């Protein structure tokens, strides 16, 4: 099962129905993506919750003003089709208004961080 797609879909659906929290399976990848979303100001908080032997991440969503459009997440690299980019050709989402989350050899980071460190990687998703 694609945990990244599950995370993105859960957040997207929660925004559609105006839910305040989202619960997803705790994986290191989901935690790192959540950390980036928190750092960039797309979500309010993250916490870990244990239910028996299972661990979950609880994302508290951040809502903007009513008239503004909510955040959009789009999965780019999929299990059946991986999309890679080197740092000079790293895509800019909406001309720099959004972010691309990239999995590199040095961990999961934003496209800006990858360009700054001059490393490429797999483009996981776009957020704007």
From Swiss-Prot:
GO CC annotation, single: chloroplast
Molecular function per GO: rRNA binding; structural constituent of ribosome
Main location: plastid
A biological-process GO annotation: translation
Pfam families, sorted: Ribosomal_S8
PROSITE patterns on file: RIBOSOMAL_S8
Source organism, top-level taxon: Eukaryota
Residues annotated as transmembrane: none
UniProt cross-references to PANTHER family, sorted A to Z: 40S RIBOSOMAL PROTEIN S15A
Stated role: One of the primary rRNA binding proteins, it binds directly to 16S rRNA central domain where it helps coordinate assembly of the platform of the 30S subunit.
Family (UniProt): Belongs to the universal ribosomal protein uS8 family.
Protein name, UniProt field: Small ribosomal subunit protein uS8c
Protein's organism: Welwitschia mirabilis (Tree tumbo)
Gene that encodes it: rps8
């Amino acid at each position: 099962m694609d945990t990244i797609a599950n995370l993105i879909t859960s957040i997207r659906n929660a925004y559609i129905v105006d839910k305040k929290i989202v619960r997803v399976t705790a994986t290191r990848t989901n935690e790192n993506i959540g950390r980036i979303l928190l750092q960039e100001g797309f979500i309010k908080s993250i916490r870990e919750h244990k239910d028996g032997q299972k661990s979950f991440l609880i994302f508290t969503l951040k809502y903007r003003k009513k008239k503004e459009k909510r955040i959009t997440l789009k999965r780019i690299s999929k299990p059946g089709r991986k999309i890679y980019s080197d740092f000079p050709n790293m895509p800019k989402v909406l001309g720099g208004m959004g972010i691309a989350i990239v999995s590199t050899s040095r961990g999961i980071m934003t496209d800006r961080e990858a360009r700054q460190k001059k490393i490429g990687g797999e483009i996981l998703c776009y957020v704007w």
